């Protein structure tokens, strides 16, 4: 997979793309990152990329020219047409399902803006996806783009050490993940559940399943509405409702 980032602040990406899973993914040739400063595509001598909005109002708006030229340059060199993603508060809410969908693509291109917003022609004529990471406002699109990229890249074949790791993650199954424990079994009187120490794999799997359902029921009950529950899982929920 290839992932391009169009940004005015390329230095923001250095630490994230050069660390942890994203770095390992590059070393394994699972992904190739390219960070491009679209200010370099500005066609005026001052390299400005923003201007005042027509009709007045506060803030500055990203001009279409540098963004259009940058996207056209990158796509002209691409082996496959990329998904062009605009990260913005008005976009589709990002979910694990969306990450899985994007992980099947060959090429992603993120447009990371700053200032008040984008010229609407960017949104209407360049973008294939508009994605939001939540109902809040950030200074720019760089952090959301990196978060989305991280979520997507870890799903690529061979990136994680244990292939089942991402399948067991919260949301991959439609539920929140069960609790995890490691050594020591007793830390300052805080003990690991006996079931996990029993060596009985069937009991351990049942415990994890139950705790996953419990955690989802308590913290994100909305996720259970569309989740196909077994008879046993329904019994557990019925018991908790009586508590």
From Swiss-Prot:
The reply to whether Methyltransferase figures as a keyword in the UniProt entry is: yes
Write out the catalysed reaction.
Answer: guanosine(37) in tRNA + S-adenosyl-L-methionine = N(1)-methylguanosine(37) in tRNA + S-adenosyl-L-homocysteine + H(+)
The UniProt entry, under InterPro entries, shows: Alpha/beta_knot_MTases, tRNA_m1G_MeTrfase_C_sf, tRNA_m1G_MeTrfase_TrmD, tRNA_m1G_MTases_N, tRNA_MeTrfase_TRMD/TRM10
Q: EC number(s)?
A: 2.1.1.228
What's in the GO CC field? Answer: cytosol
Protein residues bound to S-adenosyl-L-methionine: 113, 133-138
Gene Ontology MF: a single term: tRNA (guanine(37)-N1)-methyltransferase activity
- Which GO terms are recorded in the biological process aspect for this UniProt protein? tRNA N1-guanine methylation
Give a yes or no for keyword Transport in this entry. no
Among the Pfam families in the record, one is: tRNA_m1G_MT
Which keywords does this Swiss-Prot/TrEMBL entry list? Cytoplasm, Methyltransferase, S-adenosyl-L-methionine, Transferase, tRNA processing
Cell compartments where the protein resides: Cytoplasm
Q: Extract the signal peptide range.
A: none
Q: How does it assemble?
A: Homodimer.
Record's function text: Specifically methylates guanosine-37 in various tRNAs.
Family that this chain belongs to? Belongs to the RNA methyltransferase TrmD family.
Q: State the protein's name.
A: tRNA (guanine-N(1)-)-methyltransferase
Say which species the protein is native to.
Bacillus subtilis (strain 168)
